[in-house]
Curated annotation (Swiss-Prot):
This is Translation initiation factor IF-2. Residues 351-368 have a biased composition (Gly residues). Pfam families: EF-G_D2, GTP_EFTU, GTP_EFTU_D2, IF-2, IF2_assoc, IF2_N. GTP binds at residues 488-495, 534-538, 588-591. Residues 624-626 are annotated as: G5. Keywords: Cytoplasm, GTP-binding, Initiation factor, Nucleotide-binding, Protein biosynthesis. The keyword Nucleotide-binding applies. Belongs to the TRAFAC class translation factor GTPase superfamily. Classic translation factor GTPase family. IF-2 subfamily. The lineage of its organism: Bacteria, Pseudomonadati, Pseudomonadota, Betaproteobacteria, Burkholderiales. It comes from Cupriavidus metallidurans (strain ATCC 43123 / DSM 2839 / NBRC 102507 / CH34) (Ralstonia metallidurans). Residues 78-87 have a biased composition (Polar residues). Its main location: cytoplasm. Residues 534-537 are annotated as: G3. One of the essential components for the initiation of protein synthesis. Protects formylmethionyl-tRNA from spontaneous hydrolysis and promotes its binding to the 30S ribosomal subunits. Also involved in the hydrolysis of GTP during the formation of the 70S ribosomal complex.
Length: 979
């Protein structure tokens, strides 16, 4: 055995040698230096000392290890029905191992060593035998347990509810038995250990005193007595568990028999013949007769005892019936089957009704309400309340979403859908159960039906966008270029001014010299970068100008010095003030001889735009786009305003922006011009614009050159969207395409549902308006344009042309070329196709020619408006005008058989024509207005008779012609009307 020093032991224990020496000396081990050798006995003494100092006894010094082993197997067992089922069997084995103390040897004799080994071998054999017996016993008990569990599962399938309680009780019994078995095993192991220790010590210490052997024998006897006691406790626990299981089985059997008896009683009641209802008068007579005569079971009671009997009747009747049922009376079991339903109802609390399981107080309430019931006192009152309808209506709080179907609305109010349909019919609208209602209509219906309506908040995925936007609020804010919008009246020189700044010829490319798109450009000057937005000045582009003002920081208001303030100038001022942006006024065309800048200033002051020289805030700069006069001053004022505004935006953040313009290219697909307002837009980003989403596949600047990224205030053209977005939509960069698709689909569905609901709600109003107005001419149109903004402006301009007689109907409006589907739609709706800066492909042209569809092409918006206006004028009913062409005097009247009155007349003025319209005037009063039937001169039919000649004539459906009457001859001409 290797020797160990104090220093080595201290190193193993991670302690200092000095502290270990102190503990050894306290334990009674004489060690002075770290180099002293320490033996196993010294270690044992030190360990015993430490255990005693920590509060542990010698008995606890022994280490006990409990090993639990589980084995799961399957057995197949046939049940009573012959079916074979598989039962999971789990066998648990538990072993307790105790580490015994090291035996100190007090002698060197070989006899004691051999005897110790022999004794140890004998003890091991005894322990192995006992372990085998314990395993066999555990195996038998596991098999019995598996059989019991199979039987219990079969019982649980029949009566699941009862089995839950039985399983709980059985589990408790098994826990008790298992606990007792564990205690017995622990006691057995402790006894074996004690006996073995005593035997070893007895063999080793033969020289010891007889008193010690007697003490060891006594300890062994005590341990054996403990084992016997544990076994007895185990047997008693097992007997108690068997007894409890038997009692549970008996209780379950009793409950099953009682339930079967109850079911038989219910079946007998259902099979009994129906009883005849009696009138209240007959019932009262019978009750009165019964009170007078009485029976053997219910004798006549004195009047004074009636009230007391009624009070005690509820308690007395159950007791009496229970006694009768216990005696075996069939009437008690069936609950008075000979009585009538009226008797049961009239008796109320007197015990009438079905009686089951020995309960005689069925009453009017439930079958089991009786003396053992928890609510027997209130059963009759509860039963009667079941037949009473609620007196007050239930008012519900209904949360109405933006769109809801009739069926869902009825479900929210807990009424039938037919009730909602009836209410809608009362309100004058015919709906079906699946029809979608808008929020306003649905809330009116809810209020009409007596409930409270609230506008529900949608589970909107767009709410996540706000959170995402806040996450990047800590990005560094850097200066950004100003966004300047050039606004003004048409032909006042906006594009020419911008052209001079950019040194390019933009105006020459616009049709008719007018701007019809928003042009976005950024210009690098010596003083910094400026982004310009050139908006149209034509009146049709109101929405475009509003979008330009929304996205801008500064507005350059262009006013021609020779023209002054015009309608679109006033509109531009209103847009700028609504957006809250500063205005810089550029007075153009000052190089013309007829220019009058002072008049322009006075007119702008009247529009609340006051120049700085008058004490206002708006700088006025006279400029000329031809000579370049004042251009530098204009840029200087713009940059000065930008410095005052301190324009800043985050650069290292997801981009946000605005759709300035959008179009559909046949080869590239949807294209959108975007003005980045904050962040940096990069190629490959996932963008969301309204209901359109996609990944940026390509990005071009305003000159058509590819660009990898765009910072704040930089306009770019992107490709890769799923559809053409609406101009003016906000553009966001999202982290993944799945989220963008989810929000885009939600917006599409929301827009579609709201639009459909509003259309359905307006159908009745539209129908009534058409009935009131009579027949209205309709001009159906299909509008296709190159960009979204032009299509929007053209549609709005055409819809403004509608009148009470002719209405413009926009069947479809879109972006891109004219396709065959557009021609098919025009064929079905009999519409005219208008192409604005687009053309039809070969297939569409051939199909349109075959179907006779008219396709008109325009590149100037007011040309399209003028032609549609002329077409609408042709659809107007012509105006009828009267023209007097002659005067005729009746000189003589002739009566001709089968013809009637024929007037001999003199044409005094003008002429008279056959089939002309005439008015008969007598004493200058019109008495008839009609048409000539015939016109003759000397018995010959003539076409006309001029002034100074005589003629004979007759008037249709008028014979009361007298001498002296005046005939006024006139004709009606149709004159084409204009809008």
């Amino acid at each position: 055995m290797a020797s160990t020093t104090v220093a080595q032991l201290a190193a193993e224990l991670s302690r200092s040698p000095a502290a270990l020496l102190e503990q050894l000396q306290a334990a009674g081990v004489g060690k002075a230096t770290p180099d002293d050798v320490i033996t196993e006995s010294d270690k044992t003494r030190l360990l015993d000392y430490l255990k005693r100092s920590h509060g542990q006894s010698d008995d606890s010094a022994r280490k006990k290890i409990t090993l639990t082993k589980r084995e799961t197997s399957e057995i197949r067992q046939s049940d009573s029905t012959g079916k074979t089922r598989t039962v999971q069997v789990e066998v648990r084995k538990k072993r307790v191992l105790i580490k015994r103390d090291d035996v100190e040897s007090h002698g060197d004799g070989a006899d004691s060593q051999e005897s110790a080994e022999a004794a140890a071998e004998e003890v091991r054999r005894d322990e192995e035998q006992r372990r085998e017996q314990a395993e066999a016993l555990a195996r038998q008990e596991a098999e019995a347990q598996a059989a019991r569990e199979a039987a219990e599962r079969e019982e649980a399938e029949r009566r699941a509810k009862q089995e839950a309680l039985e399983a709980e009780q059985r589990r408790q019994a098994e826990l008790l038995a298992q606990k007792a078995a564990e205690e017995a095993a622990a006691a057995q192991a402790a006894a074996d250990a004690a006996e073995e220790t005593a035997r070893e010590k007895a063999e080793e210490d033969k020289a010891r005193l007889a008193t010690e052997r007697a003490q060891a024998q006594k300890n062994a006897d005590d341990a054996k007595a403990a084992v016997d006691k544990a076994r007895a406790e185990q047997d008693s626990a097992k007997a108690a568990a068997d007894k409890a299981r038997a009692e549970q089985d008996a209780a379950a059997r009793r409950r099953r028999e009682a339930a079967e008896a109850e079911a038989r009683a219910i079946q007998q009641m259902l099979n009994a013949p129906p009883r005849v209802l009696k009138a209240p008068s007959e019932r009262k007579a019978e009750e009165k007769k019964a009170e007078q005569t009485g029976t053997l079971h219910k004798p006549v009671k004195p009047a004074g005892a009636t009230t007391e009997a009624k009070k005690d009747d509820k308690k007395a009747a159950p007791a009496a019936t229970t006694t009768t049922a216990a005696a075996g009376d069939k009437k008690g079991a069936k609950g008075g089957k000979t009585g009538t339903w009226q008797d049961e109802g009239s008796r109320g609390k007197k015990g009438g009704g079905l009686k089951t399981r020995g309960d005689s107080s069925g009453g009017v309430g439930g079958w089991r309400s009786g003396p053992r019931g928890r609510g027997g006192k209130h059963n009759a009152d509860d039963a009667r309340s079941n037949f009473q309808a609620p007196t007050e209506p239930v008012v519900r709080e209904v949360h109405v979403p933006e769109t809801v179907s009739v069926a869902d609305l009825a479900h929210k109010m807990a009424v039938k859908a037919s009730e909602v349909i009836k209410q809608m019919m009362k309100l004058g609208q015919m709906v079906t159960i699946n029809q979608v209602l808008d929020q306003e209509t649905a809330m009116i219906v809810v209020e009409e039906m007596g409930h409270k309506a609230f506008a529900a908040k949608l589970d909107d995925p767009e709410a996540l966008l706000v959170v995402d936007g806040e996450d990047h609020g800590d990005a560094e804010m850097l200066p950004r270029p100003p966004v300047v919008t050039v606004m003004g009246h048409v032909d006042h020189g906006k594009t020419s001014l911008l052209d001079y700044i950019r040194r390019t010829k933009v105006a020459a490319g616009e049709a008719g010299g007018i701007t019809q798109h928003i042009g976005a450009y950024h210009v690098e000057t010596d003083r910094g970068v400026i982004t310009f937005l050139d908006t149209p000045g034509h009146e049709a582009f109101t929405a475009m100008r509003a979008r330009g003002a929304k996205a801008t920081d500064i507005v350059i208001l262009v006013v021609a010095a020779d023209d002054g303030v015009m309608p679109q100038t006033k509109e531009a001022i209103a847009h700028a003030k609504a957006a809250g942006v500063p205005i810089v006024v550029a007075i153009t065309k000052v190089d013309k001889p007829e220019a009058n800048p002072d008049r322009v200033k006075q007119e702008l002051v009247a529009e609340q735009v006051v120049p700085e020289e008058y004490g206002g805030e708006s700088p006025f700069v006279p400029v000329s786009a031809k000579t370049g006069q004042g251009i530098d001053d204009l840029l200087e004022n713009v940059l000065l305003q930008a410095e005052v505004l301190e324009l800043r935006a985050p650069v290292d953040a997801p981009a946000k922006g605005l759709v300035v313009e959008a179009q559909l290219d046949k080869g590239k697909g949807p294209i959108a011009t975007i003005l980045v307002s904050s962040g940096t837009l990069k190629r490959g980003d996932v963008v969301l614009a309204g209901s359109a989403y996609g990944r940026v596949r390509a990005m071009l600047d305003e000159n058509g050159k590819p660009s990898k990224e765009a910072g704040p205030s930089i306009p770019v053209e992107i490709q890769g969207l799923s559809e053409v977005p609406a101009a003016g939509e906000e553009v966001l960069v999202l982290p993944d395409e799945r989220k963008a698709r989810e929000i885009a689909l939600f917006r599409q569905g929301k827009f579609r549902d709201v639009k459909l609901a509003k259309q359905q709600a307006a159908k009745l109003e539209t129908m009534l308006e058409q009935m009131a107005e009579g027949e209205v001419q309709t001009l159906p149109l299909i509008v296709k344009a190159d960009v979204q903004g032009s299509q929007e402006a053209l549609v709005q301009s055409l819809q403004k042309l509608s009148t009470s007689e002719v209405r413009v109907q926009i069947v479809h409006g879109g972006v891109g070329g004219i396709s065959e589907s557009d021609v098919n739609l025009a064929t079905a709706s009999k519409a005219v196709i208008i192409g604005f800066n687009v053309r039809a492909d070969a297939g569409a042209r051939k199909l349109a020619e075959h179907n006779g569809i008219d396709i008109r092409y325009y590149n100037i918006i007011y040309d399209a408006v003028d032609e549609i206006k002329a077409a609408m004028s042709g659809m107007l009913a012509p105006e009828k005008r009267e023209t007097t062409i002659g005067q005729v005097e009746v000189r003589q009247v002739f009566r001709v058989p089968k013809v009637g009155a024929v007037a001999g007349c003199m044409v005094t003025d003008g002429l008279i024509k056959r089939n002309s319209m005439v008015r008969v005037l007598r004493n200058n009063v019109v008495i008839h207005d009609g048409e000539l039937d015939s016109l003759k001169r000397f018995k010959d039919d003539v076409k006309e008779v001029k002034q100074g000649f005589e003629c004979g004539l007759s008037i249709k459906n008028f014979n009361d012609v007298q001498e002296g009457d005046q005939l006024e001859v006139y004709e009606i001409t149709e004159v084409a009307r204009t809008l």
